[in-house]
Amino acid sequence: MSKRTYQPNKRKRLKTHGFRSRMSTASGRRIISCRRRKNRETLTA
């Protein structure tokens, strides 16, 4: 039997989906601007 795919890890979560990592790429900045446009409560993880 295979293990569950979600193995929570705070550091990995932020490194992958955090604000700094989003801002470091053009597509990430696009994600943030789209979420700002939608008035999302949380922009990033």
UniProtKB/Swiss-Prot annotation:
NCBIfam families: rpmH_bact. Transmembrane segments: none annotated. Keywords: Ribonucleoprotein, Ribosomal protein. One of its GO terms (cellular component) is ribosome. PROSITE patterns: RIBOSOMAL_L34. It comes from Tropheryma whipplei (strain Twist) (Whipple's bacillus). Pfam families: Ribosomal_L34 (PF00468). The gene is rpmH. HAMAP family: Ribosomal_bL34. This is Large ribosomal subunit protein bL34. GO terms for biological process: translation. Residues 1-45 are annotated as: Disordered. GO terms for molecular function: structural constituent of ribosome. Residues 1-20 have a biased composition (Basic residues). Belongs to the bacterial ribosomal protein bL34 family. InterPro entries: Ribosomal_bL34, Ribosomal_bL34_CS. It comes from the Bacteria.
